[in-house]
């Protein structure tokens, strides 16, 4: 799963959101490393909707602007949970490899 897809699913885990809210949440979730462009966001949302992982969750007009809301489906929640488990497993293995490398370095030297 690509990072923009993961960030959109993670942002929707907190409840339904509109496009601007998803962009802001993705930026916050990534510690401001990722700013989703509008085109990227809606391409991700369209793909996730086709896969049954997100669904439209209503529309409204706020300050004269049309907002469409999205929410996770049960399948989307399952996919997000599975990706979190994969990322945690990968991170744990990377930490273990790093710890092994650090423990085999000669004192004062670079291995």
Predicted regions and their residues:
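Amphipathic alpha-helical dimerization/coiled-coil segments
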Residues: 78-111
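Basic, amphipathic "hinge/linker" alpha-helix immediately C-terminal to the N-terminal HTH DNA-binding motif
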Residues: 61-84
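Basic amphipathic alpha-helical segments that dock to polyanions
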Residues: 41-48
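Short beta-strand "wing" residues that participate in macromolecule-binding interfaces
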Residues: 56
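Glycine-centered, phosphate/nucleic-acid-interacting loop/turn motifs that mediate DNA/RNA or nucleotide
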Residues: 52
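A cross-family signal for key residues in well-ordered alpha-helices
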Residues: 10, 24, 46, 81, ...
């Amino acid at each position: 799963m690509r990072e923009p897809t993961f960030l959109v699913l993670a942002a929707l885990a907190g409840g339904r959101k509109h496009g601007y809210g998803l962009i802001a949440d993705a930026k916050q979730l990534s510690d401001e490393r990722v700013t989703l462009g509008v085109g990227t966001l809606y391409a991700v949302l369209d793909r996730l909707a086709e896969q049954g992982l997100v669904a439209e969750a209503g529309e409204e007009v706020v300050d004269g602007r049309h907002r469409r809301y999205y929410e996770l489906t049960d399948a989307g929640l399952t996919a997000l949970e599975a990706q979190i488990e994969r990322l945690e497993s990968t991170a744990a293995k990377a930490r273990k490899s790093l710890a092994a490398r650090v423990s085999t370095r000669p004192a004062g030297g670079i291995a």
